[in-house]
Amino acid sequence: LWAASPLFNGNKDYANFRNEEGKPFINQEFSREKWVRTAEACKEAIESAETNGCQLYDCSMDMSYSQDLPEEIFYSMNIRQTVTERFNSELIWSVGKQGTNELQNLSMACIVPSLQQGSGNGQVTGSILQSRAAGVYAPTLETAEQFYSKNGVPIDEDKEWLTSGKYDNRYTTRQVTSADKYNMRTGWTTAVLHFNREPRFYGSLGFDGSTWYGNGRTDVNDLNYVDGKYGRNSGNKWGFNYSITGYFAKKVVYYQNAITQSSQVVYEYPFPIIRLGDLYLMYAESLNEATEGDNNVPEEVYTYLRKVRERSGLKKGVLGQTEDIGDVRVAWEKYSNDPTKPKTKDGMRSIIKQERKIELALEGHQYNDLRRWKDASKELSKSIKGWNVQGEIEEDFYKVTTLFVPRAFTTKDYLWPIKKQDLQVDDKLIQTYGW
């Protein structure tokens, strides 16, 4: 996959990066054949995995009471459990479980009512509690925006969002009604951006006013929730250990972890490196890129995207959906302002990229995907934004805030340098381009 991708396949940015014989380290002519071989390898890997029992994970496989869950929670739990359920049916290759204890502590929002800040034991106890659920791994506002609408298309393409003014007013607020009670706390005021999103949005992210299934409460009518404003339980209450963006990485926190004011139980799990959903998306991408011409997208590309989307609740008959939105052609034709996008190779390239960003969000793939696509110079040079987490009331909290302006990501940053000591040991080594 890496060899076929733009970074290493016909990348003329590195035309002058050559060996001692003057030959480019990176081939200068694009080869479609590399994508053909990648597609063949992905298909072989899929067949091997499925033959040996791998299948897309469904939380009903492990949660004895999942059949009683409302659809909103069931499908959001599918994406959470795909990552955190130990040795589940989708896992192909993982790292050891060591480290996921700390990962979960640093990702978990403090959803247990802590003692009020004060003097003596009250302050100490509250601080300890917050250290068990620090929430410092903070997804960005851009991450929140990249998830689809409930119609399975990008929010900046969704005709319902555009014509109603919802997209332009997505940073304004509205009150949660009982219609959204499984995703957000009824009566809470939160951003318009948080309404009418796909299940993976609610399964991957916690935010001010969002419900948090499990972790001590599984009664769907009395769920934990995030109280993320300044001075509140999930927010900046102690001056440390809080999300600087206002978002939390719910996806990587196992739902059976239990945190109270006096104790903590965290179930470690092997963190996925490659899972079947990832492999399906690799295959769809490779098959699309291997196709000659711009209007001959193979049917299998749509088939494998459908598998991933439908597992996530993007399908007819779920959450009141009347259209077959598992098929991106149907979703875009019905709901997008760019209805022909899935019919072209270039359009499908864009769709597959976003599908990977959504499906694999918070799993450590996006940085390297952006590198191999040669999109990092644009995407990783953007300002990091979030909500104003120093705000105590809605009017102050829901203000988009620039938290960090990174230096520009340039051509040299796609490849890392060889350290000076190694160059001194072997004088025939050639330093990486730009360093």
Give residue ranges: language-model regions.
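Alpha-helix boundary/N-cap detector
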Residues: 135-139, 192
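Acidic/polar-rich alpha-helix caps and helix-coil junctions
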Residues: 1-130, 151-435
